Regions:
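Donor-binding and catalytic core of enzymes assembling or modifying cell-surface/extracellular glycoconjugates
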Residues: 209-293
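N-terminal regions that are enriched for targeting/export leaders
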Residues: 1-33
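Gly/Pro- and small hydrophobic-enriched strand-loop and loop-to-helix capping segments
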Residues: 45-57, 273, 286-300
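Histidine-anchored nucleotide/phosphate-binding helix
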Residues: 33-46, 194-202
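Short, flexible/disordered intra-domain loops and linkers
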Residues: 23-28, 182-191, 242-253, 276-277
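Secretory-pathway luminal glycosyltransferase catalytic domains
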Residues: 2-15, 62-208
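Short, solvent-exposed loop/turn segments at secondary-structure junctions
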Residues: 56-61, 128-130, 177-181, 216-220, ...
Length: 300
């Protein structure tokens, strides 16, 4: 593999910045941001650059520890770059099961782009796919350090666990993505579709274990209340990406972040989705917290 030379002696650090809007578009979901962060960390290591993530300009920063702006970044003049880049060249939808996903053209494009930047610290948004899927502990520690709940959020997490009757690491997560149209557009969800997912779950769960249901559909969660082993949390949630967020001032951001943290304290994650791609929200939460993860495709 022949790569172009990185010759920008001025550039010292690249930062993946998660906020709602950029000069050329709006952000996708949190999972996309986490995926791109793993990708950029690998690029930074390859080129000998420092790497950092920054969520200080996103509404969820209100609920996180030590979320401060980074010197040298103009948050009003950031762009989206290489969004969803480095996808499998053969069009495979399950390539994350492999250990590598190396695309020299993608890496060279980034090198060429970075060579043009006249700054020491470069902030931008990237959701590209990593080249390697064996993620280093140092990278996981770095990302986790920026996603720590503050005192208010920790109290909210503890209160919620007590309300549910669950303890940290004492439950599994079943994360069900019925489709963003049910979360964002509040489309009515078909009862036959609900029962189809419910039957899959009934064949999945063990009678001696506890499961917390996380989903983009509160309607679906209500239908799972009748299953003894399943616990549900019915609260207003919000898509965290700027492209689909309806209200950045509502409690929805806080509650979606709550679901992320509850998932991070689980002992297993089952991710079910109508999409052909794996949910980054649950997948990367599992990776960051060393939680066993299994993906199940839902066919409508």
């Amino acid at each position: 593999m022949i790569l172009n030379k990185f010759v920008n002696n001025k550039l010292k650090k690249i930062v993946n910045v998660y906020q709602l809007n950029y000069i050329n578009g709006s952000s996708p979901g949190l999972g996309d941001f986490l995926r791109g962060s793993f990708c950029l960390n690998q690029i930074a290591n390859l080129l000998g650059l420092e790497f950092e993530i920054d969520v200080s300009n996103h509404p969820m920063a209100k609920y996180l520890e030590h979320s401060t702006h980074i010197h040298g970044i103009d948050y009003n003049n950031l762009e989206i770059a290489f969004q969803n880049g480095n996808k499998d060249q053969n069009g495979s939808i399950d390539y994350e099961g492999r250990q590598t996903n190396i695309n020299p053209n993608f890496i060279n494009d980034i090198i060429n782009w970075l060579n043009t930047k006249d700054c020491e610290v470069l902030g931008f948004f990237c959701s590209a796919f990593p080249s390697f899927f064996n993620h280093k502990p140092e990278c996981k520690a770095l990302i986790n350090s920026k996603l720590q709940p503050n005192e208010f959020m920790r109290n909210y997490i503890d209160y919620t666990l007590s309300e549910l009757g669950l303890t940290k690491k004492g439950y599994g997560i079943i994360h069900v993505r019925t489709g963003d149209n049910y979360l964002v557009n509040e489309d009515p969800i078909d009862i036959h579709f609900i029962n189809k997912i419910k039957n899959i779950i009934l064949n999945l769960i063990s009678p001696d274990r506890r499961y917390l249901i996380i989903s983009d559909s509160n309607v679906f969660k209500k239908h799972m209340k009748s299953v003894p082993q399943c616990y549900t949390l019915i609260r207003k949630i919000e898509h965290l990406g700027g492209e689909r967020m309806k209200n950045d001032k509502s409690t929805g951001v806080m509650n979606t972040l709550l679901e992320y943290f509850l998932m991070s304290y689980s002992n297993a994650i089952f991710s079910m989705s109508v999409y052909f791609h794996i949910s980054g929200f649950s997948k990367y939460c599992g990776i960051l917290n060393d939680i066993p993860f299994k993906y199940i495709k839902i066919y409508k």
